[in-house]
Amino acid sequence: MAKISKRINKIHEGVDRNKLYDLSAAIGLVKERAVAKFDETVEIAMNLGVDPRHADQMVRGVVNLPNGTGRTVRVAVFARGDKAEEAKKAGADIVGAEELFEIVNGGKIEFDRCIATPDMMPLVGRLGKVLGPRGMMPNPKVGTVTTDVAAAVAASKGGAVEFRVEKAGIIHAGIGKVSFDNAKLEENIKAFADAVIKAKPSAAKGEYVKRVSISSTMGVGVKVDPSTVKVVD
């Protein structure tokens, strides 16, 4: 118990919960307080001035992080014939059509990202109740419904991150690992923030980006001055 208390104290030590840190300082604090015995993910949370209950205020998109995410992404592709072969050659972990549908429909999800060719969507659409809640339903808006399956697989493996605002108006995403250089984390964070800003719906009024914070998997959240992540309304 004493060890746990000591670890918690170390995580919170030196972090002012009411202060807005510039991005560089915030990254340093997060890395210094990552004391878990594994390479923790660095996560960002952005509170947005939108009400996602209204369809015209939904914020979603995809961004290719310049330095990747640091994690191994397992990719499934729904495709037939030549497109299935293209997906396999590009490094997709699972490729199939009706047989893959049966596996997924049975609740066996052994992938992190799902891609489909347009002709497969009548079949894949029937998996909405399985893939939808997990945020894995292929969507042309984020490049996961496409005829260029090779490029989609490469992007998914290379650092493509999907984002979608939650009910409370918050967007969460993993943008790297604690082992990354500070500069690489900063580049990833700025790329992610820029993508979220560009996805601002026209129906959003007033302040768009209200708060930004970063943390590690097991660490404390550090508030970031939005202006230092190039957040401008």
From Swiss-Prot:
GO terms for molecular function: rRNA binding; structural constituent of ribosome; tRNA binding. One of its GO terms (cellular component) is cytosolic large ribosomal subunit. It comes from the Bacteria. One of its GO terms (biological process) is regulation of translation. Keywords: Repressor, Ribonucleoprotein, Ribosomal protein, RNA-binding, rRNA-binding, Translation regulation, tRNA-binding. It holds the Pfam family Ribosomal_L1. Signal peptide: none annotated. Coiled coil: none annotated. NCBIfam families: rplA_bact. Part of the 50S ribosomal subunit. Binds directly to 23S rRNA. The L1 stalk is quite mobile in the ribosome, and is involved in E site tRNA release. Protein L1 is also a translational repressor protein, it controls the translation of the L11 operon by binding to its mRNA. Belongs to the universal ribosomal protein uL1 family. This is Large ribosomal subunit protein uL1.
